[in-house]
Amino acid sequence: MTGTAHAAFRRLFNEIGPVDQVGIEERVAKYTTRSIKKGSKLFGLKLAASMVDLTTLEGKDTPGKVASLCQKALHPSDDPEVPTVAAVCVYPSMVKYARRALGEDTGVRIASVATAFPSGQAPLKTRLAEVRSAVTDGADEIDMVINRGAFLAGEFQLVQDEIAAVVLACGSATLKVILEVSELETYDNIRAASFLAMRVLRPNDFIKTSTGKTSLNATLGNNQVMIEAIRDFYLDTGTPIAMKPAGGIRTAKQALQFLIAVKETLGDEWLNNTRYRFGASSLLNDLLRQIEKERTGAYQAPYYFSEAAESY
């Protein structure tokens, strides 16, 4: 890191404060030991299901695969009390097929990764054109990636300016800003990137942990750093920012631990799919299995539930 970058980081941390890493780890360790009563557990499982962005982001995606994903999103279970998921998440080229499969006013939104996902390594003009194309084809939400190289070089104004340009390109579509926490490496960097994004986002736009394409994705630790940043930003500005951990959350047990973290850090106002999401696919089937177990007392075999894509 250059001397200029060091100076930029020092100035930012003087504004927002560093992360207490020991405190973060102590807090997240407690979330894993919480016991949940039966009624609360069933509520939490259904809530988590309603927060899923059901995702397929593979090179072998086809219109037929996306249509199947959309059917899973609309009808995750034969149990009428199980909610639909929050959204499906697909590549920009698949948005029109998702819109065709979902129709209008179903309650399931269409999210699309854009801005040269997952690397972000394309000219800004190209990235913005991809955003506009996805929105024109029917995307309700855009998941963008930040310029990690610029961030790590201390070029914070460039990072913010690019996010602000994507906000404008989104129009009325919700924006989710992916930090790619594995490449940021430290909790301090994750907090700093969160603040840079939040300062140019609109109420209920999102910050998001990961693309799901690297070795380290969402953890209770990096989720905690980001939701504490959201809390601090909200207390300072009154602007509510939403959160999406993505990648690596595959079990109902994990999802409930993340929801405990949200409740204890941000409160009940964030316990809805407007302000909290899970970027996942395999998670949904485990949630459905656990819901069935709570309802009937018996586990269903994994093949009982239709398969969604397993890319996250």
For every predicted segment, state its role:
Residues M1-A48:
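Charged, compositionally biased N-terminal leader segments and the immediate start
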Residues G39-A49, K60-P83, S93-M243, R250-S281, ...:
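Alpha/beta enzyme core
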Residues L57:
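A short, histidine- and acid-enriched strand-loop-helix "catalytic/donor-clamping" loop
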Residues D286:
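N-terminal beta-loop-helix "entrance" segment that forms/cooperates
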